[in-house]
Regions:
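Interfacial loop-to-transmembrane junctions
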Residues: 21-28, 211-235
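Alpha-helical transmembrane segments
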Residues: 6, 46-55, 113-130, 190
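Alpha-helical transmembrane segments of helical membrane proteins, especially in multi-pass transport
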Residues: 178-209
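Structural signature of hydrophobic alpha-helical transmembrane segments
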Residues: 1-8, 44-56, 195-202
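Long, highly hydrophobic alpha-helical transmembrane signal-anchor segments
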Residues: 67-141
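Juxtamembrane boundary at the C-terminal end of a transmembrane helix
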Residues: 240-249
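Cytoplasmic-side transmembrane-helix entry/capping segments in multi-pass membrane proteins
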Residues: 23-32, 50-52, 71-84
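N-terminal signal-anchor/start-transfer transmembrane helix
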Residues: 2-20
């Protein structure tokens, strides 16, 4: 349950600061986090664990940015720390056993999948939407040559849209929209056991992108952008699918 809560709070926070203005995002993020924590407590999440999750999610929001062409203030370090936190929380969730919260008995007794699996599927889906883009961009900024970084924004500015800073990330049309849809599709097909269809999606993406990449000339930046971004995006989708599958066992 704690893993699902962490992914959900981070996912909701990133969606809010991407699509809302600064003031609205500053109000929406704590409200959404409180709602997610309350729901988790009602189905049996330990209060101390929920408090730790809120701290971890806050650290993520303070060390990352959803601004498309702004250099991530924390680089890839927040993503690495998040992976470690997810592994630890997954182990804690597995050791905790069946949830015992006020809403757990009726939910567990239903014909639906286990509540832990349902919660993790929702949390992973929210995370893959915008937080996946955050990690992909952090990997691209690390791997591709960049201009001098812009001054580090104040923490409150990371919750809102800003004018893009000067950056040299190659532009592949529709990447910010296609990426989340692709991750959700791959994760869903993997969970459904349709590995062949998931592979077809990956192949189709390469075919569709080939004309745009081939016009890149001799620099090869778009090809590297496509390769690095795709591999990171696919790894996130498969990782989330694995977490959901494990939660059902």
């Amino acid at each position: 349950m704690l893993t699902a809560l962490l992914l959900a709070v981070i996912g909701l926070g990133d969606l809010a600061r991407t699509h809302l203005r600064r003031r609205a995002a500053l109000l929406a993020v704590p409200v959404l986090a409180a709602a997610a924590v309350t729901a988790a407590l009602l189905v049996g999440a330990p209060p101390l664990g929920a408090a730790i999750v809120v701290v971890l999610a806050g650290a993520w929001l303070l060390t990352t940015t959803t601004v498309e062409n702004a250099r991530p203030p924390g680089g890839l370090r927040p993503a690495v720390a998040l992976v470690a936190a997810v592994l630890v929380l997954t182990a804690v969730d597995r050791a905790a056993g069946v949830p015992t919260g006020p809403l757990a008995p009726t939910t567990v007794a239903s014909t639906l999948p286990p509540i832990e699996q349902l919660a993790l599927a929702v949390g992973a889906g929210l995370f893959l939407l915008e937080s996946g883009n955050v990690i992909v961009r952090a990997a691209l900024f690390r791997e591709l040559p960049q201009a001098e970084p812009a001054p580090r924004p104040r923490w409150s500015e990371r919750f809102a849209r800003r004018e893009p800073a000067d950056a040299r990330l190659p532009d592949l049309q529709g990447g910010r929209t296609i990426g989340p849809l692709e991750r959700l599709l791959i994760a869903g097909l993997t969970l459904a056991g349709a590995i062949g269809l998931a592979g077809a999606v990956l192949a189709a993406k390469g075919i569709v992108r080939f004309p745009e990449i081939s016009r890149d000339g001799g620099s090869g930046e778009k090809a590297e952008y496509f390769l690095v971004g795709s591999l990171v995006s696919w790894a996130l989708a498969l990782g989330c699918a694995g977490l959901v599958a494990i939660a059902g066992r």
